Regions:
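Mobile active-site "lid"/loop adjacent to the S-adenosyl-L-methionine
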Residues: 87-116
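A short alpha-helix capping/helix-coil boundary motif
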Residues: 27, 97-100, 123-128
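Conserved SAM/SAH cofactor-binding pocket of Class I
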Residues: 2-76, 85, 91-93
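Short amphipathic alpha-helical segments
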Residues: 48-49, 95-98, 144-150
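C-terminal lobe and adjacent flexible extensions of AdoMet/dcAdoMet transferase-like proteins
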Residues: 174-178
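Short, Asp-centered acidic motifs that coordinate Mg2+ and/or phosphate
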Residues: 82
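Conserved Class I SAM-dependent methyltransferase catalytic core
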Residues: 113-173
Length: 178
């Protein structure tokens, strides 16, 4: 229920090759700009191939090859009205590592931490901004990540809500209200 989707500042975080953000641009055709943040350079070429197929010159797609820890910096503070994200699911030491370093970086918080990820979302959300991301609860690993999110955010103006559950994965909504 954003009044002017054309001015909506959107981020696809942990973007991979950008498919989720690109798909969003088809469902919300009034969107004019999307930033994509990904740490793995292997996705860069695929991202540019994907946007070449979009054929919508009114869209501005910006690719940032960086760690989400960068979102803690002033430059990114209060920057996005909408964030969508499919982050890693597993904590180091929980779950089976793959022989592939590439797959492990997709699946595990190896380049930073879960706490840093949540703080990065909170810092980069604008007032009244919303972030949607996937979260594996990991209760079978003895973890309660949703409770961890609430603890991380308790001294902030950001709230967390479980809005749906799909095949063992929760969809989490963070909202910032200053």
């Amino acid at each position: 229920s954003y009044p002017d989707l054309g001015s909506l500042r959107v981020l696809d975080l942990c973007a991979g090759c950008g498919v989720i953000g690109i798909e969003l641009s088809w469902y919300l055709q009034a969107i004019r700009q999307i930033d994509f943040i990904e740490i793995q350079d292997i996705y860069t070429e695929y991202f540019y191939q994907n946007i070449a197929n979009v054929n919508r010159p009114e869209l501005q797609f910006r690719w940032h090859l960086l760690n989400y820890d960068e979102l803690h910096k002033k430059k990114w503070e209060d920057k996005f009205d909408l964030i969508i994200s499919n982050p890693p699911y597993f904590q180091p030491g929980h779950g089976m590592l793959s022989p592939s370093k590439f797959k492990n970086r997709c699946r595990f918080y190896l380049d930073s931490s879960f706490q840093s990820y949540i703080q990065a979302l909170g810092n980069s959300l604008a007032n009244r901004g919303k972030a949607y991301f996937l979260l594996r609860p990991l209760k079978h690993h003895g973890l309660d990540l949703f409770s961890d999110i609430q603890k991380i955010l308790q001294e902030t103006s950001v709230t967390a809500t479980k809005i749906s559950h799909i095949r063992g994965t929760d969809i989490i909504l963070l909202e910032k209200l200053k």
